[in-house]
Every structure is written in structure tokens, then in C-alpha cells.
């Protein structure tokens, strides 16, 4: 199983999930380029787009010899993983989406500042997005919509903030905010893949996510009638509070 993380985290977001699945599956959780412990070349040396990131992950999968595999996608990992699915529909055995969106109705008003940058990629609109990189924002993303915030271990968001504070990381993330519009433009392509190939599909969704709404999870059934949808009473980073429950859902799903 290929595990693809989101913003602003890295492969460490799967630290509580992997031990609960490792007895049954081979699990690979690479840090995307510019994230975690992967290389972070300057934007002058590498153009940070989701297409380029998908190209690298595609090559990574080839190098490690994954020929048939499931993907677990979250947030930014979803458009990367869905690109791989479109390219190699015969290689994917299942898709698990944790707040990984592919439908317009899944995007909340929380995206409005980023939408403004898509519509007018001016310097003021770019600078307005820096607040998304602030430590308190990372903490807020982890705790928003979580009934009991004491259930969240601080190691996750502290490590995320460490990575975000590296020199040059801010410009990389701002570039990716701007390029996220390329993912929205591909939603019809992703949806056509779902309709055409009807992959085995499980959504495990934090229903209180301020960015990716429950409607985005429910929309998968429009193109994959057999999709299984589970909602959890938590926020964006559902694994921080519900890793055990999500692992159980995955085991049950893949055993069918």
C-alpha cells in the first residue's frame, strides 16, 4: 500500500496507522518532494507543481517495484495518487481516501483566499496566504473539529512546523497553493476514471474538516456506486484521533 500524505505534514502522519496494518500489508509512506525528509530543491531548480510531484512518485513506485498496490491518499496526496490511478488503472487494487477530494462540492469556503490567488496570482494575493504557514494555523488545523483536543499528540504539529520553518519552505508551499488549481481542473478527469474503472473505494473522512467537506466524500458514490463511506467525529487530520478505527475499516474493506 502506498500512503500519500498532505499539507503541511509528511510520512510521519501515518505513524499510528502503520503499526496497525504492518502485519498484513507492505506499507510505503514517502515524503513528497519539498516535505519532511525528502529533498527540498529551490524553486529555481525544481518547479513545484502537483504534476511534477506525481511524476516523481510515479518513478519512486517504479524503482521500488510496486506493480499492483492500493493507495491511501490524504489532502495533497489525493491529486498525486489520482494522477497515478489515471495513468496506471491496471496497477491499482484499491483506493482509500482520507479527506482526499476530487469534487467541487468538497471544497469549503476556507479555500476562498487561495481561490483569490488562482483568479489573480498577484503578489498581494500570494502574501495573503502566508498566514496558512503560521505555527498557530498548523495547530488549529490539527485541533479544529476535534471534540477532545487532549487526544492529539503534539509531536505531529510540532514536527510539521519544524519543516515549515526551514529556509525556503514558505515559497515552495505558496507555489503549491497556487498550483492546486491544476488539481481542480483535473476533477473531471479523475471522475471519468472513477466512472470508467469503478475501483474498489473506501472513504474515511473527518466530518468536521474545515477545508474538505463531507459532500466531497459522498460525491464519490456518484461515480463509484459501490464506494464505502465512513465519517468520523473529528477534523482534517483524522488519523490523529481515529487511527485505530480507520485501521479497522481498512482491514475490513480490503478483506472483502
PLM segments and residue spans:
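Short hydrophobic "strand-cap" motifs at the C-terminus of beta-strands
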Residues: 4, 30, 204, 234-235
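A short, glycine- and basic residue-enriched loop/turn
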Residues: 10-11, 79, 235
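Catalytic histidine-centered segment of alpha/beta-hydrolase-like enzymes
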Residues: 234-247
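Conserved HGGG/HGGXW glycine-rich cap/lid loop of the alpha/beta-hydrolase fold
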Residues: 1-37
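Flexible "cap/lid" subdomain of the alpha/beta-hydrolase fold that forms the substrate-access gate
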Residues: 28, 35-72, 76-230, 245, ...
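Active-site pre-Tyr helix/loop in NAD(P)-dependent dehydrogenases
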Residues: 7, 101, 237
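Conserved acidic functional residues
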Residues: 6, 75, 240-241
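Short, hydrophobic alpha-helical segments
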Residues: 250, 254-256
Amino acid at each position: 500500500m502506498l500512503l500519500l500524505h498532505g499539507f503541511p505534514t509528511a510520512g510521519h502522519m501515518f505513524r499510528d496507522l502503520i503499526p496497525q496494518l504492518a502485519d498484513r500489508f507492505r506499507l510505503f509512506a514517502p515524503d513528497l518532494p519539498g516535505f519532511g525528509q525528502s529533498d527540498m530543491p529551490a524553486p529555481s531548480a525544481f518547479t513545484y507543481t502537483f504534476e511534477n510531484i506525481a511524476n516523481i512518485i510515479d518513478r519512486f513506485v517504479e524503482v521500488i517495484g510496486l506493480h499492483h498496490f492500493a493507495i491511501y491518499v490524504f489532502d495533497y496526496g489525493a491529486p498525486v495518487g489520482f494522477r497515478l490511478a489515471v495513468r496506471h488503472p491496471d496497477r491499482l487494487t484499491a483506493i482509500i481516501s482520507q479527506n482526499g477530494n476530487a469534487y467541487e462540492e468538497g471544497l469549503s469556503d476556507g479555500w476562498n483566499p487561495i481561490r483569490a490567488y488562482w483568479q489573480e496570482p498577484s503578489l498581494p494575493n500570494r502574501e495573503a496566504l502566508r498566514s496558512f504557514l503560521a505555527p498557530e494555523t498548523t495547530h488549529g488545523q490539527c485541533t479544529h473539529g476535534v471534540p477532545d483536543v487532549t487526544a492529539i499528540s503534539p509531536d505531529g504539529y510540532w514536527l510539521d512546523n519544524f519543516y515549515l520553518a526551514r529556509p525556503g519552505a514558505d515559497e515552495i508551499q505558496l507555489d503549491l497553493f497556487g498550483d492546486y488549481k491544476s488539481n481542480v481542473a483535473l476533477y473531471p478527469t479523475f471522475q471519468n476514471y472513477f466512472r470508467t474503472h469503478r475501483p474498489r473505494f473506501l472513504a474515511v473522512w473527518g466530518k468536521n474538516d474545515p477545508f474538505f467537506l463531507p459532500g466531497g466524500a459522498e460525491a464519490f458514490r456518484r461515480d463509484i456506486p459501490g464506494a464505502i463511506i465512513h465519517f468520523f467525529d473529528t477534523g482534517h487530520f483524522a488519523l490523529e484521533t481515529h487511527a485505530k478505527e480507520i485501521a479497522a475499516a481498512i482491514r475490513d474493506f480490503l478483506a472483502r
